[in-house]
């Protein structure tokens, strides 16, 4: 699909028989992470406040998150263990950076069961009630990342609704809805 091509990652494949030939099939790749994340995030966004976002991690899911945020005209910055031309390191996160990026999305597996006593190394003390912390992890329902955000008054959301919405999107693709 055009969105999966732009993102550069596929997590759902549609297999269709080529018309008129029973031996050939066409495969089309889709990215339902994009759909699930975007649909679950929209109700939480206040565009007067949420103009910039930090995306923790640089794996496949981070690309879908970045594309969804960009489509909502939210400026993004990737944060990774290693610096690169398109990302900063956790060590570079200052009070000013946290302050100006009101959305922080964890796309890493940090905090996932059974390693629940782990979380991204960010300066949580600079979070406020204007911040929105979104963790793609959904087990446990409240990760240490979300718990620390909640402690400072941030709006928090786990990845459970995203998971459900991406499953529905995949179902629609496979059943041509």
Show the residue positions of the predicted features.
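Active-site capping/gating segments
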Residues: 39, 154-177
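Short, well-ordered alpha-helices that flank and scaffold nucleotide-derived cofactor binding pockets
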Residues: 39, 43, 67-71, 147, ...
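NAD(P)-binding Rossmann-fold cofactor-contacting core
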Residues: 72-88
């Amino acid at each position: 699909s055009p969105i999966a091509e732009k993102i550069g990652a596929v997590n759902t494949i549609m297999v269709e028989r080529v018309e008129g030939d029973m031996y050939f099939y066409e495969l089309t790749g889709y990215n339902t992470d994009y759909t699930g994340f975007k649909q679950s995030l929209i109700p939480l966004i206040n565009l007067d406040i949420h103009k910039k976002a930090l995306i923790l991690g640089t794996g496949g899911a981070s690309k879908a998150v970045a594309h969804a945020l960009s489509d909502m005209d939210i400026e993004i910055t990737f944060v990774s263990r290693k610096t690169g031309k398109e990302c900063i390191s956790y060590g570079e996160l200052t009070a000013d950076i946290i302050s100006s990026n009101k959305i922080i999305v964890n796309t890493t597996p940090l905090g996932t069961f059974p390693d629940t006593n782990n979380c991204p190394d960010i300066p949580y003390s600079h979070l406020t009630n204007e911040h929105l912390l979104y963790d793609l992890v959904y087990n446990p329902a409240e990760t240490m990342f979300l718990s620390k955000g909640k402690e400072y008054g941030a709006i928090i959301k786990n990845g459970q609704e995203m998971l459900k919405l991406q499953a529905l999107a995949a179902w629609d693709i496979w059943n041509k809805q």
